[in-house]
Structures are given as structure tokens and as C-alpha cells.
Swiss-Prot record:
Decreases the levels of phosphatidylinositol 3-phosphate, a phospholipid found in cell membranes where it acts as key regulator of both cell signaling and intracellular membrane traffic, in a subset of endosomal membranes to negatively regulate both endocytic recycling and trafficking and/or maturation of endosomes toward lysosomes. Residues 1023-1055 form a coiled coil. Zn(2+) 2 binds at residues 1136, 1139, 1166, 1169. The lineage of its organism: Eukaryota, Metazoa, Chordata, Craniata, Vertebrata. It catalyses: a 1,2-diacyl-sn-glycero-3-phospho-(1D-myo-inositol-3-phosphate) + H2O = a 1,2-diacyl-sn-glycero-3-phospho-(1D-myo-inositol) + phosphate; a 1,2-diacyl-sn-glycero-3-phospho-(1D-myo-inositol-3,5-bisphosphate) + H2O = a 1,2-diacyl-sn-glycero-3-phospho-(1D-myo-inositol-5-phosphate) + phosphate; 1,2-dioctanoyl-sn-glycero-3-phospho-(1-D-myo-inositol-3-phosphate) + H2O = 1,2-dioctanoyl-sn-glycero-3-phospho-(1D-myo-inositol) + phosphate; 1,2-dioctanoyl-sn-glycero-3-phospho-(1D-myo-inositol-3,5-bisphosphate) + H2O = 1,2-dioctanoyl-sn-glycero-3-phospho-(1D-myo-inositol-5-phosphate) + phosphate. The gene is MTMR4. PROSITE patterns: PPASE_MYOTUBULARIN, TYR_PHOSPHATASE_1, TYR_PHOSPHATASE_2, ZF_FYVE. It is found in: Early endosome membrane; Recycling endosome membrane; Late endosome membrane; Cytoplasmic vesicle, Phagosome membrane. The modification Phosphoserine is found at residues 8, 610, 629. This is Phosphatidylinositol-3,5-bisphosphate 3-phosphatase MTMR4. It comes from Homo sapiens. Zn(2+) 1 binds at residues 1120, 1123, 1144, 1147. Its EC number is 3.1.3.95.
Length: 1195
């Protein structure tokens, strides 16, 4: 026998149970056109007639020339072949996808592949949710993705929290029964059941034998103001024999009695401000309660008549008696009233939805659209559901009566009515957290059969059990959101995502049929939760119109004419504009747009245009000409198409271009990465043949700056765009070219007010505080270095070093560098691809590129020398102080990423994001993250909302996306106020890419990929509201910066003022004058005169020395003062001992003594206060050094 070793099980990881399958390609040169998720593996890849098609274990991806289809496999309802060459794919959310093939054989082959991929699973592990969770959990901390797996604390402790929130009297009136522990009574009910306190478990067992599926009447909601409760159950099993059950009748009437014994705040004289109730009715109830309050609980008035709401029609209820069911008889249930709502069963709803899908898949503009939509009866079914919920809400709120809701089995129409009524009654369920609790408690805990209704239950072939019940309920919530847009914390995108993942099987939330099955299969621990994606801290799903203080009871209009078709789900392609296509021109006129973006700061320079056609600008056959200035850059690129074709799927069949790096590096395959972005004004001026205007004459403070900046740094500060070329390893101009540019800078033309003395003083103060020692190590690609070592340049904008960029812009743009900081440099290792308006793709060679941009290839060796001498330097950032660059360039958290959703140019808190490719990916893949963002933290894929081109294409062997460097707040503003970011998780391997233009509308619908790998739902209204909010935050931040700059300017003025005259003793002279006879200057030596003489030598006293820092209370701070991340159990609050504000641990982790606060030991301070204290100490030391020679000379 061989050597004995440890058991092999110790070496098995969870992801090893789900190994990726081998990829089958129809052509060897094809590459996967999307970025896979954790555990996702592409199994088939080939070409259709006009598209690229791929099937993974999670999704079907079809890349057309002008669109992309991205559908999870479990969302596909049926696949069939039509017209011999066409695949007709029907989805469970009513979408219909058609894909054409060139041959009948190929069509049948892909039909067979897709049919096998979408077949019912043989075992639960065949669902992708298990593989996704296993691959999200790695052995190392870097591979952990637990934030994608676990729900929040409000989900785990929802039952206890709900009982406390609704104010149940668990001592005298109600009790929590554990009769269903381990699901021994009813597998489709939760383990804890709320019943009246005098109902015993034996009676509950007897009632369970009388109710269908043992689903007994239990209470699920209590109205806080009047104590009325909502209960739910299934139908009674009366059958044709007319069976009765005394315990069931007693339990139903006991619910009404318990509500009378546990009145709400109205009966006890509490607040009456909730809802739209009649004032006289509230006063009468309060008066009646005051008469009986002294006599105790026993003297409470008779219980209200309980309403039994049967969701079925009376005919259907009676017909169910033949199957052993039935309905309650009012004669047997005293003090009860039975009402039938006439809601259709699941078979009618399924047929209606199929008709709706057929209507939505017709031609875009059918002549009979309205009549066809009416014939589906989908809106009619929604109307009946809303009417039932409104009846329950009015009965509870206005009449104060308890309600018992049931249908046949109690797991389809019953949760629809109960959950919708709770949304109408309780504003908590209209919040993000409350809505999640509502879905968990009323749908999942009470056994809605998601596995059967959604069609992903294993070994079930009966299609009659499939029905979009939950989708229909979400549609009704969408109708409420349309009618009450200010009363819901979540937006439409939240509901659309919930629809997608009800069927996607990416998360385990909606797997299995009841909680008993989920617990037996350990689904909660083996799969991720959808609430991790739809968490409350994700600002992508926040409704910016939400009014949190409103507690109004909703009374919606339920008529069919007031309802709307949910186009975001049923007709997603009908939306008039996507976020990738829309820009500020949709909302603002050209004049208003200019004022919106350039007028927020009085000293911001307007953006100018240097060429009419960016496409012809890249053509060397046409000379570069300068045109008149125009601040509206977006208006001149309307006809440009965004090239979204991957490099491997050129429709013309052109070969992949190989470009020589120019410095002896290996050749790299470059894909079709679209058109070059619109260049900012200064970069266009640099590329044009016209000279620049000089800034040196705008203010005498420029000379002061020149004297303060070291010579080595002054060579890098001639222009923002030139500086960026030097930062990102592109060939830099030689010193002679820079001198020429410096002599010809007069073309820009800036008013004198744009170069105030404050900028010089501010920049000088930064030079003094930095001592020119905080240098940023910018990552470079080793293959572009002549010596094979990484080159590093110095981005001045990340230091406190002044440059002409500071003079070109206002004080506010010191922290918001121009878009050139994000523009891709002209790099010899990048093949620039251009596409003319007709759609043909042309490749511009390396030599043609450089010929149109003269004097850019000189001085590369000089850059390499300067870059290599800066290794190991520290980065001095106003937010973090001095620290190694690696600590600053770090991936941000998931909660921080959610802050940047569709904020345009106003991303006010950004420290760094990471984009890489999953481990094991051996081939370059195109990251279709045009506008939105998905993230895989810790060396996995991360995408940020907004235009993000960080991974348009990449090579595993060193081709990464360039890092976007910026100053303190770290965001980069592109032309027209849009953002562009390039992200990399490997700072030492960076290469340039050519992004797609940001502001050019495209007929190609872009992909907004989220954490789930699916397109992000677009909402132009919420997008505009985010822009408005972000603009407000930016204005506030600019005002804060201006205040800080003004304070620093005043401090420097006091610090740099000439020293006062040394104090001398004039007391003898004054005494002589005072004692002399006939002196008229007797008052000259008074105390007032002495004060006037010595006033100039007084040191300024800071107000903080006489004030006590008051801390912001914990309950008033829900978000970090700096990064605006939300506090929760794992993100605690930290007070800064200097300013008193509340921060998270990342923004408040440094310690310093604060003598001004009598804190002589190091205490916790925020990053900004840390820097301020450090600067103040350095200024005090400098002042002391200046006073020493003066005191020596005077002595």
C-alpha cells in the first residue's frame, strides 16, 4: 500500500462539488461575450444567423449586432422551432425571444441544447443557486463573498420583531403556540403560530383536522390604532355532508373577542393621526372608551362582527364541497359575516397570462392593441385583487373589525389579499425592509408553492400547477406605486429585480414549496439570499420621492381604467429611452444645460469644442481644424453609434488586429472596443493645430507658484491632459515640446477672475504642508517599459502640488479633476478602432495614430527615470493623511458602491473600485458593463453604476484597465457632466483601453449589469432625481471646500504676515510725559493706548479654544458623515473627538492628541480632522521657527 495521508475529504472545497463543464465551441476563435458569475460556466458557444449565442449553467446569452438578450435559463418557459430556422423562446415573465439560424440542422441542435438546459431539474443541486453559493464561499478571505449570501438581521429575527412592533399583548390576550415546531402539524405553516391565549394546543389539533391541509386560522397582523386583526387560513372541509367543528367555530369567534380585549391606541386615548378616518367617528370611539376605561378589561364592549372574506366566488366555493371543501355558514359561526370576492383560480390566471404574453409578442404597433389587451383580462384580475385588499383594509381601519381571509388552500389568493391589505394599512411594509419582511412572512413562511408555481420544482412535469401568482401580486404593488409615488421607499427597479429572481434560481429565497422543505434541504445555508442584492442600503432601489414620515392608509382607485400595463416587465423594449442613451438634453435646453453643469460653481470654466466630427479627427487624411467654442458637446455626436460588437464577432468576418507595442513588448490582441470618447476641450486643443493661450499672465500669483513647485514637478504641470499622458505610461512630450506648449497656451482664454490670488495661496499652503514628499506611485504595465520594469509617473492632481490645472479651474475642481484624468491616453500599445457612420469598422494603425499627434513620442525614457525614482513614496490625501498608496487604492465596500448609482458626474464619495476576471478564466472576455455596475469584491468582478468602461476588453496576461486617478474625493468628471471610470484590481499591470463614447446616444441598448449579471432596470425619472440629489450634495460639498479654503487662506495670511515690531519697554517715556507739568497727553499712557500698541502682536485665538465640541447623538446619525454609508450591525458608529460628527470605521480610525480639547492622550479623530490637526501643528512649528531669529535679533 502507498503512503497514508489525511482523509481526502479535508481537501474538498464546496465549489469542487460543482465543477465547470467543458466548453463546446462551434468555432475555435469565438470568445465568451460576457463576464460569468461565481460558479457559472459556459457550456455551448456558437453563431446564429445574425448573432452570437451562448448557453451557460445559468443563462442564455444572445449577442445581436444592435442588442443583447440575457435571460436566466429558469426564466425560460418553453422553447420551440418555428419556420424551420427560428427558435421561439417564451419566458415566464412574458418576454419572447426569437433567434434565427442559417441551417435547419443548426437550429435543431440548439433547440435540443436549450431544451435540455431548461428541463425540470432531477435534484435540487441541479439549480444554479447551489453552485453559485458554493463558489462564493472560498477558503481564503479574499475569495469570500458572504455579503452576497446572507440577508439582513431584520429577516432573521422578523417574527419576534413583528410581534413587538404591532403591539400584541402576549401576557393577557395572545400567545405564541409552538404546536408546529419541527413542522409536525402543518409543513406549509411557520413553526410559531399566534392564537388567542385561551386556545389550547389540543383544540388547535382538532381544528387542523377540519381545515384543508391543516392550515388553521392564525393571526398575522394587528392594527395599532384600533386593535383589529387580520387572520388567514384555508377552506373548511364541510363536504356534501355539511360537517361542523365546534373547536373551529370557537377559534374563529375567539379571534374577534381577543381583538376587543386588546384595543389599540384609539380606545386607550392614544394618537388619532393615522389614516384618512372620519374625525367624528374617531372622537366617538374615544368617548366610548373613556366611559369604560375605569371598569377594566372585563367591561369591554361586545366584540365587533368578524368578516370572513372568501376569495372565491360563491359558485366555486359551493362546488368545492364536492371535493371535500366548502365555506363557512353564518348560522354556525356567530357574530361573523361571510363575503365572496369572486377571484379567479390559478388556471384562469395562467391562461390570462399566456394571452398577455401572446399580445405583448405581437408587432410593435398592432391596430387592435387595446382590445387585445382587454381580452386577456389581466387588468381585470388585478382590479378584483385590489378591491379585495381595499375591502380588508377598510374593514380593519375604518370599521375596526377583524378579518379572516382564505381561499381554497390558502397559499395563492390568500397571501395576495393579506399582503396587499397590509401594505395599504401599514407604512412599514412600504419600506424596503418592511417589504422584505412582508414577502418572507406572508409568502414564504405560509407556504406559497414557489417551486410548483414558478416551474423549478424537481421531478414535476405537471404544467397545470404553474401560475404567475406572485408576479400578479407584484404587478398590483406596482399599480399602488404608480398611484402613490411618494409613499413607497422602493422604486420600480426593486420590483423588476424581484420578478427576475423569482424565476432565475440564482438565489435560494424562492426555492422549494414551503419552509419545511427549505429546512430539510438546508437551502438557507446552501444558497444566497435575494435580499443581499435588494438590501435596504442599496441606493439603486431607493425611491427619491419617498416621504418617510407619512403614515397614511392607502385607498387606491381599483377601476380597470386606472390601471396600467407593467411595461418594464411585459414590454421592456418599449421604453422610450435607456439611461445609456439619455443625457441632460432630455431634461434641459442647451442654455439650461450649460447653466446646470457650468453654473453650479461660479468659477468653473465652460467646456469647449475643438472639432466638429471626432470620427474624422482620427482620420489622418483630413487635417485637424479648430472650430468655434461650444459648451454643448453632446449635440455634436448624435449620429455616432456605440460599437458593442466583441472583437471576436466582427460581422464582416475581419481578422483580429494585432498591434505592435512599439517598445519590444509582446503583441496583444485588441478587440473592437467601440469609438473613442469625446475629448475634453484642453485635450482637443492639444491635438489641434491651433496654438494655446497662456495662463502665466492671468495673475502675479503664478510666479509665486512657480517658485514653490520643484523643477521636477513643474515639468509635469503644463497642462492637465499632458499630465495625464505622463501618468498613464503613454509617451510624453520632451521638454522642448513642453516649453513650446507653455509658450502657446494663450489659445484657451480665461478671464482674470479665474485665477484669483486665493488659488495661489491655497496651492502654496498645500506645497508647504506636503513638502513635496507625497508622490503617487501610478501603476504601469511592465511590457511597455523599455527596461521591463514598471514605469511610474506622478499624478500631481492627487497631491497637494499646484499646477496649471489648478489655475485653469476653480477651487472646487481641485477635488474634482477634469475629465482628462479619466481619458485614455494615446498609447502605442493600443490599437485604436474607429467606426464610420455607415457601420464599417476600420482599424487605425499605430503609425497613423502618432502621425496625427506630433511630439508625443519623445521623452519616454525620461518618464521612466522619473517614475522609477518615486517608488515607495507616500500619498498625501486630504481625507487620509499620509499613507502608502496601496492603502488608498483599495476596493470599496458593497454599501459604498450602491451610493454611486446613476449619479452622473456627482459621485461625491469614491475611493477606488476593482475590476478583474474570475480565477480560472483563461481567455480574454469582454465586460459588457456600459452603464451599470456589478461587483465581485476582493479580486473578483466589480462594476459600478453609471457609465463604466473598465473592462471593455482585457487579456489575462497583463492587459488590464487603467486606473483613474483623482484627488481627495476620487471621482472623475467627464465631458458633459458624465462619469467614466477605469478600474483595476492589479495596480502593477495596467494598459490603456479605448472606451465607448459617453454622451453619444446609441441605438444599441446598453447593458447595466448588476451583481446578478442581468441588465439593470432603467427609470429616467429616478435617474434624474438622483442627479438632482447628487447635484445638491456636490454644491454642499463645494461650499464646504470653499469654507475650508477660506479658513486656510486666513490662517496662512496670519502665518505669512510680516512679524510685528519687537516689543520694547516704553513705560518710562510715558511716565515722564505723564509727570511733566502742563502735559496734554495724560491719557496717552492709559490702558487703552497700551492695548492699541500691543494689538498687532497678539496671536489670533481660535474660537474652538473657547468652545466645547458637542457630539452628534447616535440616533440622529443613520449614515456616515463622510462616505454616507449606512450604519448597521456590522458597520458601527464612531465619533470624532475633534468635530463631534459620526463616521464609520473607515473614515474615523486615526488617533491624535487634541490639546485644544484638553485631550492630551491620542484619541479617535476622523480623517479630515487628522489632516487639519497635522497642518496646524506644522504651521505652529513654522511660526515658532520664524519667531526665534526675531527674538534673537531684538535681544
Amino acid at each position: 500500500m502507498g503512503e497514508e495521508g489525511p482523509p481526502s475529504l479535508e481537501y474538498i472545497q464546496a465549489k469542487d462539488l460543482f465543477p465547470p463543464k467543458e466548453l463546446v465551441k462551434e468555432e475555435e476563435n469565438l470568445q465568451v461575450p460576457f463576464t460569468v458569475l461565481q460558479g457559472e460556466g459556459v457550456e455551448f458557444l456558437g453563431r446564429a444567423a445574425d448573432a452570437l449565442i451562448a448557453i451557460s449553467n445559468y443563462r442564455l446569452h444572445i449577442k445581436f449586432k444592435d442588442s443583447v438578450i440575457n435571460v436566466p435559463l429558469r426564466m425560460i418557459d418553453s422553447v420551440e422551432s418555428r419556420d424551420m430556422f427560428q427558435l421561439h423562446i417564451s419566458c415566464k415573465d412574458s418576454k419572447v425571444v426569437r433567434c434565427h439560424f442559417s441551417t435547419f440542422k443548426q437550429c435543431q441542435e440548439w433547440l435540443s441544447r436549450l431544451s435540455r438546459a431548461t428541463a425540470r431539474p432531477a435534484k435540487p443541486e441541479d439549480l444554479f443557486a447551489f453552485a453559485y453559493h458554493a463558489w462564493c464561499l472560498g477558503l481564503t478571505e479574499e475569495d469570500q463573498h458572504t455579503h452576497l449570501c446572507q440577508p439582513g438581521e431584520h429577516i432573521r429575527c422578523r417574527q419576534e420583531a413583528e410581534l413587538a412592533r404591532m403591539g400584541f399583548d402576549l401576557q393577557n390576550v395572545w400567545r405564541v403556540s409552538h404546536i408546529n415546531s419541527n413542522y409536525k402539524l402543518c409543513p406549509s405553516y411557520p413553526q410559531k403560530l399566534l392564537v388567542p391565549v385561551w386556545i389550547t394546543d389540543k383544540e388547535l389539533e382538532n381544528v387542523a383536522s377540519f381545515r384543508s391541509w391543516k392550515r388553521i386560522p392564525v393571526v398575522v397582523y394587528r392594527h395599532l390604532r384600533n386593535g383589529a386583526a387580520i387572520a388567514r387560513c384555508s377552506q373548511p372541509e364541510i363536504s356534501w355532508w355539511g360537517w361542523r367543528n365546534a373547536d373551529d367555530e370557537y377559534l374563529v369567534t375567539s379571534i374577534a373577542k381577543a381583538c376587543a380585549l386588546d384595543p389599540g391606541t384609539r380606545a386607550t386615548g392614544g394618537s388619532l393621526s393615522t389614516g384618512n378616518n372620519d374625525t367624528s367617528e374617531a372622537c366617538d370611539a374615544d368617548f366610548d372608551s373613556s366611559l369604560t376605561a375605569c371598569s377594566g378589561v372585563e367591561s369591554t364592549a361586545a366584540p365587533q362582527k368578524l368578516l370572513i372574506l372568501d376569495a372565491r366566488s360563491y359558485t366555486a366555493a359551493v362546488a368545492n364541497r364536492a371535493k371535500g371543501g366548502g365555506c363557512e355558514c353564518e348560522e354556525y359561526y356567530p357574530n361573523c359575516e361571510v363575503v365572496f370576492m369572486g377571484m379567479a383560480n390559478i388556471h384562469a390566471i395562467r391562461n390570462s397570462f399566456q394571452y398577455l404574453r401572446a399580445v405583448c409578442s405581437q408587432m410593435p404597433d398592432p391596430s387592435n392593441w387595446l382590445s387585445a389587451l382587454e381580452s386577456t383580462k389581466w387588468l381585470q384580475h388585478l382590479s378584483v385583487m385590489l378591491k379585495a385588499a381595499v375591502l380588508v383594509a377598510n374593514t380593519v381601519d375604518r370599521e375596526g373589525r377583524p378579518v379572516l381571509v382564505h381561499c381554497s388552500d390558502g397559499w395563492d389568493r390568500t397571501p395576495q389579499i393579506v399582503a396587499l391589505a397590509k401594505i395599504l394599512l401599514d407604512p412599514y411594509y412600504r419600506t424596503l425592509e418592511g417589504f422584505q419582511v412582508l414577502v418572507e412572512s406572508d409568502w414564504l413562511d405560509f407556504g406559497h408553492k414557489f417551486g410548483d408555481r414558478c416551474g423549478h420544482q424537481e421531478n414535476v412535469e405537471d404544467q397545470n400547477e404553474q401560475c404567475p401568482v406572485f408576479l400578479q401580486w407584484l404587478d398590483s404593488v406596482h399599480q399602488l406605486l404608480k398611484q402613490f409615488p411618494c409613499l413607497f421607499e422602493f422604486n420600480e427597479a426593486f420590483l423588476v429585480k424581484l420578478v427576475q429572481h423569482t424565476y432565475s434560481c440564482l438565489y435560494g429565497t424562492f426555492l422549494a414549496n414551503n419552509p419545511c422543505e427549505r429546512e430539510k434541504r438546508n437551502i438557507y445555508k446552501r444558497t444566497c439570499s435575494v435580499w443581499a442584492l435588494l438590501r435596504a442600503g442599496n441606493k439603486n432601489f431607493h425611491n427619491f420621492l419617498y416621504t418617510p414620515s407619512s403614515d397614511m392608509v392607502l385607498h387606491p382607485v381599483c377601476h380597470v381604467r386606472a390601471l396600467h400595463l407593467w411595461t418594464a416587465v411585459y414590454l421592456p423594449a418599449s421604453s422610450p429611452c435607456t439611461l445609456g442613451e439619455e443625457n441632460m438634453d432630455l431634461y434641459l435646453s442647451p442654455v439650461a444645460q450649460s447653466q446646470e453643469f457650468s453654473g453650479r460653481s461660479l468659477d468653473r470654466l465652460p467646456k469647449t469644442r475643438s472639432m466638429d466630427d471626432l470620427l474624422s479627427a482620427c482620420d489622418t487624411s483630413s487635417p485637424l481644424t479648430r472650430t468655434s467654442s461650444d459648451p454643448n458637446l453632446n449635440n455634436h455626436c448624435q449620429e455616432v453609434r456605440v460599437g458593442l460588437e466583441p472583437w471576436h464577432s466582427n460581422p464582416e468576418g475581419s481578422e483580429t488586429s494585432f498591434v505592435d507595442s512599439g517598445v519590444g513588448g509582446p503583441q496583444q490582441t485588441v478587440g473592437e472596443v467601440g469609438l473613442p470618447p469625446p475629448l475634453p476641450s484642453s485635450q482637443k486643443d492639444y491635438l489641434s493645430n491651433k496654438p494655446f493661450k497662456s495662463h502665466k499672465s492671468c495673475s502675479p500669483s503664478y510666479k509665486l507658484l512657480n517658485t514653490a513647485v520643484p523643477r521636477e514637478m513643474k515639468s509635469n504641470t503644463s497642462d492637465p491632459e499632458i499630465k495625464v499622458l505622463e501618468e498613464t505610461k503613454g509617451p510624453a512630450p520632451d521638454p522642448s515640446a513642453q516649453d513650446e506648449l507653455g509658450r502657446t497656451l494663450d489659445g484657451i482664454g480665461e478671464p482674470p477672475e479665474h485665477c484669483p490670488e486665493t488659488e495661489a495661496v491655497s496651492a502654496l499652503s498645500k506645497v508647504i504642508s506636503n513638502k513635496c514628499d507625497g508622490v503617487c506611485n501610478f501603476p504601469e504595465s511592465s511590457q511597455n517599459s523599455p527596461t521591463g520594469t514598471p514605469q511610474q509617473a506622478q499624478p500631481d492632481s492627487m497631491l497637494g502640488v499646484p499646477s496649471k490645472c489648478v489655475l485653469d479651474h476653480s477651487l472646487s475642481t481641485v477635488c474634482n479633476p477634469p475629465s482628462a484624468a479619466c481619458q485614455t491616453p494615446l498609447d502605442p500599445s493600443t490599437d485604436f478602432l474607429n467606426q464610420d457612420p455607415s457601420g464599417s469598422v476600420a482599424s487605425i494603425s499605430h503609425q497613423e495614430q502618432l502621425s496625427s499627434v506630433p511630439d508625443l513620442t519623445h521623452g519616454e525614457e525620461d518618464i521612466g527615470k522619473r517614475g522609477n525614482n518615486r517608488n515607495g513614496q507616500l500619498l498625501e490625501n486630504p481625507r487620509f493623511g499620509k499613507m502608502p498608496l496601496e492603502l488608498v487604492r483599495k476596493p470599496i465596500s458593497q454599501s459604498q458602491i450602491s451610493e454611486f448609482s446613476f449619479l452622473g458626474s456627482n459621485w461625491d464619495s469614491f475611493q477606488g473600485m476593482v475590476t478583474s476576471f474570475p480565477s480560472g478564466e483563461a481567455t480574454p472576455r469582454r465586460l459588457l458593463s456600459y452603464g451599470c455596475c456589478s461587483k465581485r469584491p476582493n479580486s473578483k468582478q466589480m462594476r459600478a453604476t453609471g457609465p463604466c468602461f473598465g473592462g471593455q476588453w482585457a487579456q489575462r496576461e497583463g492587459v488590464k484597465s487603467p486606473v483613474c486617478s483623482s484627488h481627495s474625493n476620487g471621482h472623475c468628471t467627464g465631458p458633459g457632466g458624465k462619469n467614466q471610470m477605469w478600474l483595476s484590481s492589479h495596480p502593477k499591470q495596467v494598459s490603456s483601453t479605448k472606451p465607448v463614447p459617453l454622451n453619444c446616444p446609441s441605438p444599441v441598448p446598453p447593458l447595466y449589469l448588476d451583481d446578478d449579471g442581468l441588465p439593470f432596470p432603467t427609470d429616467v425619472i429616478q435617474h434624474r432625481l438622483r442627479q438632482i440629489e447628487a447635484g445638491y450634495k456636490q454644491e454642499v460639498e463645494q461650499l464646504r471646500r470653499q469654507v475650508r479654503e477660506l479658513q486656510m487662506r486666513l490662517d496662512i495670511r496670519h502665518c505669512c504676515a510680516p512679524p510685528a515690531e519687537p516689543p520694547m519697554d516704553y513705560e518710562d517715556d510715558f511716565t515722564c510725559l505723564k509727570e511733566s507739568d502742563g502735559s496734554d497727553t495724560e491719557d496717552f499712557g492709559s490702558d487703552h493706548s497700551e492695548d492699541c500698541l500691543s494689538e498687532a502682536s497678539w496671536e489670533p485665538v481660535d474660537k474652538k479654544e473657547t468652545e466645547v465640541t458637542r457630539w452628534v447623538p447616535d440616533h440622529m446619525a443613520s449614515h456616515c458623515y463622510n462616505c454616507d454609508c449606512e450604519f448597521w450591525l456590522a458597520k458601527r458608529r464612531h465619533h470624532c473627538r475633534n468635530c463631534g460628527n459620526v463616521f464609520c470605521a473607515g473614515c474615523c480610525h486615526l488617533k491624535l492628541p487634541i490639546p485644544d480639547q484638553q485631550l492630551y492622550d491620542p484619541v479617535l479623530v476622523c480623517n479630515s480632522c487628522y489632516e487639519h490637526i497635522q497642518v496646524s501643528r506644522a504651521r505652529e512649528l513654522m511660526s515658532q521657527q520664524l519667531k526665534k531669529p526675531i527674538a534673537t535679533a531684538s535681544s
